[in-house]
A protein has these predicted regions:
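Active-site acidic carboxylates
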Residues: 1-132
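Glycine-rich oxoanion-binding loops at beta->alpha junctions
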Residues: 137-147
Length: 147
């Protein structure tokens, strides 16, 4: 399957099983998923402990990739879709209830996935560079997966 010939690895050079992909502007949408402060903005510590400094250093390559590749590429896609009048949709994790009682079991459990993002929480908002415009769909979900 190839969308175009510019970004096809030589591995797929002769793969024509799926043929050309035709993008029908009326049937195609861009779905931007979880581009929220809580996931893609570096945490800020007032007086970081040594452990927090080490953890920040460990995560720095991730945040650099977010800043230099993920956000700019999402912004380019958003611009292109909007200029073409194509549908743009967003999905974000956020509770519907302030106490978070509607969260998934994963996000209620303690540990890695524990997350409480009630309505109005700044960290739940989509970063400004990728923010939805008026009349764009935003689906609020209470767990990690959107599909």
């Amino acid at each position: 399957m190839r969308v175009n010939n510019r970004y096809v690895s030589f591995y797929y050079e002769n793969d024509m099983d799926m043929g050309e992909i035709v993008i029908d502007k009326k049937k195609t949408a861009l779905l931007v998923i979880d581009m929220q402060h809580v996931f893609i903005t570096r945490p800020v510590y007032e007086n970081p402990t040594e452990e927090q400094k080490k953890e920040a250093q460990r995560w720095e390559p991730f945040y650099q990739k977010i800043d230099q590749v993920v956000v700019p590429n999402n912004a380019k896609l958003l611009k292109a879709f909007r200029e073409q009048g194509m549908e743009v949709c967003f999905a974000k994790i956020q509770c519907q209830k302030k106490d978070g009682s509607d969260r998934s079991l994963d996000q209620k459990a303690t540990g890695y996935n524990e997350l409480l993002l009630p309505p109005g929480t700044p960290s739940a908002e989509i970063v400004p560079e990728l923010a939805p415009m008026e009349d764009e769909l935003v689906v609020t979900k209470t767990t990690d997966s959107v599909l």
